[in-house]
Amino acid sequence: ERIKGKALQLAFFYRNFLREYKVFIFDHKEHINENYEISDMVEEIAYCIKKLNIDKVDVVGVSQGGMIAQLLAIDYPDIVDKLVLVATTSRNNPTTNKVIDRWIVLAENGKLQELQKNMIETVYSKGYIAKNKWLSILVQILFKPKLDQLDRFIVLARSCLKFDIFDKLDKIQAKTLVIGAALDQVIPVEFSNELAKKINCQKLIFEKSGHAVHQEVSDFNRTVLNFLKSSD
């Protein structure tokens, strides 16, 4: 889902940050080729940060955004001050690859409703789905990609399958918090544990949440903000 035209929704979701921060939310560029990779996304964000004349940023990355954030901190250590990595991994793995491969197949075959259903069941925990009966209806309303957007989705999904920077994690200099979810079906919590151990940083695991931990946990943004405001 693209972020253009969603300023009000995003401002509401990130309202806790607005008194302390100027918040920038990045989308991928309009035209991407089939070889588009995480490293390309990192270069684009670094370019934007420099063009905005920003010296230092605190970066919060969720899922694929967490992959981008890791590599940004590695390749541009002078830019990143603090880093929050949410429901993400430093390398592909059989569980994640199986989930993403399934999404790609459904997208390639234009099975949008089945893709929506599978994503809801995989991204959110069963408990959260049970408590929020409106979730599937909301996703059907908001997630209505055109065929060219499905092609885009496939390219972005495939970029995760090729991602592996585990051996570079010791280059991260930024103060880092890793947030994982015990019920994550997309990126198992063991990879959050692995990430925190390799970086040698703080870790927080939410025991009752799924991959969409940033949506499921009511005080998630406050937790992140407290870390970002904490003194070194």
Question: Which positions does each model-derived feature cover?
Answer:
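Gly/Ala-rich beta-loop-alpha elbow adjacent to hydrolase catalytic centers
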Residues: G61-G65, A69
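Conserved alpha/beta-hydrolase "acid-adjacent" motif
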Residues: Q185-F191
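Short beta-strand/loop motif that positions the catalytic acidic residue
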Residues: I172, V178-G180, D184
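Conserved alpha/beta-hydrolase catalytic His-Asp/Glu region
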Residues: P94-N97, E114-L161, F166-K168
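Flexible "cap/lid" loop of the alpha/beta hydrolase fold
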Residues: I74, D81-K111
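Catalytic histidine-centered segment of alpha/beta-hydrolase-like enzymes
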Residues: S209-N221
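Conserved acidic catalytic loop of the alpha/beta-hydrolase fold
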Residues: D40-V57
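Conserved HGGG/HGGXW glycine-rich cap/lid loop of the alpha/beta-hydrolase fold
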Residues: E1-I32
